[in-house]
Amino acid sequence: MKRALVSVSDKNNLVPFVKGLVANDYEIVSTGGTKRVLDEAGIPTISVEDVTGFPEILDGRVKTLNPYIHGGLLARRELPEHVATLKEHKITPIDLVCVNLYPFKQTIEKPDVTLAEAIENIDIGGPSMVRSASKNYRDVTIVVDQADYDQVLAEIEKDGSTSLETRARLAAKAFRLTASYDALISQYLTEKAGETAPEKLTLTYDLKEAMRYGENSHQKAWLYEDALPKAFSVLQAEQLNGKELSYNNIKDADEALRCVREFSKPTVVAMKHMNPCGIGQGNTLEEAWDRAYVADPVSIFGGVIALNRKVDLATAEKMHKIFLEIIIAPDYDEDALAALKTKKKNLRILKLDFSKKDEATSKETVSVMGGLLVQDQDVLDEDFADWECVTEAKPTQEQLESLLFAWKAVKHTKSNAIVVANNERTLGVGAGQPNRIDSEKIAIDHAAEALDDRAVLASDAFFPFSDCVEYAGKHGIKAIVQPGGSVRDQESIDMANKYGIAMVFTGVRHFRH
């Protein structure tokens, strides 16, 4: 007769699985609550205490940490000396372990969890058994996921045991589980200790889906979600219509959400290839849409749209007229949703709770060859009070509002970034050029006939030379916002004074790559 050790916190589907083991001549060793469930189901079990000859102690903290358990798991059956040691100490080999771990993740996700509660839900004995069984997978089957119950039983019923290939696969899966489990504990305790740059960094994510392809069709791709999901994330959005999200869809939608959360008035952000092609705000969402659309009616085709208010019918009918990849909003009126779905089976319509948009943000990571860059997200809260006017001309209140709008927009534009705007919408966006003057030329060219005495300009970084200010002055720009900090700042200030431009320094740069 073979022996299985069963000790789980999640008891779903457990009884049928264990009954299958018993039917195939396994005796069952179990602990605590698991044993009670199996006993109540009429399944004969042996308590761990009967195996070890030692009771549970320290409120259950020590149950299975015993040579009679780990010797039975780690002994190599092909080595005569190991077999002799088992016989000498009367240790019975264990052939299968079914374990899942204390719900540490679920515990720390509770809003009012205490450190003491979290600590008590750090499993010690479970991971120890998982690791012992996994290390000795040549002889022991480790089962940590109820999704594997059926396959394990099927192989046992057919061949008397699982295959070596299956045991190796299950062992790798089990080590992934313990690694992820430890990573969450490490992350939680590191945050509690106030450490921001630990000497070791282990991140853990859960596979959400395999994607059709990556950034390009020849690239394979998978979507993983943070093991502690963030509420304000495209990955938490409810999809109401359309095809599955692509790799590029998710990146654009993420950037659109980052951008739209900057604004408090009804706002529409149109994102294309990680750059805003149009941002509009107004007293109503429809008005905001009109302004975002007119900002660049060409580039918005095939774009990703983020809105920060519930979508009404009037706005929906206007969006429905053009091809869009994604619409994401806090909610939709019933008739608005129906209108968007009409003859648009592929349009991805997403609903996301915007009430959590200001929750604490996690670190950003970017992979580089051989490493990982980690930084805080660029979520600095800025306002007029943080700015310094450095020119003879001073911005009017309307210009200040326009400058703040443009500053929020340029923050989400790829560097080198220039945005021309008023306090209602972007007029022109220049993104991603190796030199700043070229980005400015693109932005002003896009603004074209919309340039008037209300137009202002924002730059994500300082002007290295005065040419950008001169170009702006020649095209009628009357107010500029930029970080300042160049060794040639005075040249730019002098040029602004020459053209009567009000220029403010923020002291903060917003590179985005």
Swiss-Prot record:
Gene Ontology biological process: 'de novo' IMP biosynthetic process
Reactions the enzyme catalyzes: (6R)-10-formyltetrahydrofolate + 5-amino-1-(5-phospho-beta-D-ribosyl)imidazole-4-carboxamide = 5-formamido-1-(5-phospho-D-ribosyl)imidazole-4-carboxamide + (6S)-5,6,7,8-tetrahydrofolate; IMP + H2O = 5-formamido-1-(5-phospho-D-ribosyl)imidazole-4-carboxamide
Ranges that cross the membrane: none
SMART domains, A to Z: AICARFT_IMPCHas (SM00798), MGS (SM00851)
Domain MGS-like: 1-144
Pfam families per record: AICARFT_IMPCHas, MGS
Gene Ontology MF: a single term: phosphoribosylaminoimidazolecarboxamide formyltransferase activity
EC number, UniProt record: 2.1.2.3, 3.5.4.10
Keyword set, alphabetical order: Hydrolase, Multifunctional enzyme, Purine biosynthesis, Transferase
UniProt pathway annotation: Purine metabolism; IMP biosynthesis via de novo pathway; 5-formamido-1-(5-phospho-D-ribosyl)imidazole-4-carboxamide from 5-amino-1-(5-phospho-D-ribosyl)imidazole-4-carboxamide (10-formyl THF route): step 1/1; Purine metabolism; IMP biosynthesis via de novo pathway; IMP from 5-formamido-1-(5-phospho-D-ribosyl)imidazole-4-carboxamide: step 1/1
GO terms under cellular component: cytosol
HAMAP family referenced in this protein's UniProt entry, alphabetically: PurH
Domain notes: The IMP cyclohydrolase activity resides in the N-terminal region.
Family: Belongs to the PurH family.
Record-given protein name: Bifunctional purine biosynthesis protein PurH
